Curated annotation (Swiss-Prot):
GO terms classed as biological process: siderophore biosynthetic process
InterPro entries: MbtH-like_dom (IPR005153), MbtH-like_sf (IPR038020), MLP_fam (IPR037407)
A GO cellular component entry from the record: cytosol
Extent of the signal sequence: none
Pfam families from the UniProt entry: MbtH
Top-level taxon of the source organism: Bacteria
Alphabetized SMART domains for the sequence: MbtH
Name this polypeptide is given: Uncharacterized protein YbdZ
SUPFAM superfamilies in alphabetical order: MbtH-like
Organism: Bacillus subtilis (strain 168)
Amino acid sequence: MANPFENADGTYLVLVNEEGQYSLWPGFIDVPSGWTVVHEQKGREACLDYIQSHWSDMRPNSLKTVENV
């Protein structure tokens, strides 16, 4: 079986968790607990573009808070 996370023709969601980390998620798989949909189903490239334009700081939110104290 092919990896559903690498299907160039698939539709995906963009998820984010409370740490501000993003995930490209296949649209047909249930969203896991602790993750929120921030970009509805689109093609893989559109979702990757969204992630690239919105996730500019790769540090988890908890680490950003500690470093800014």
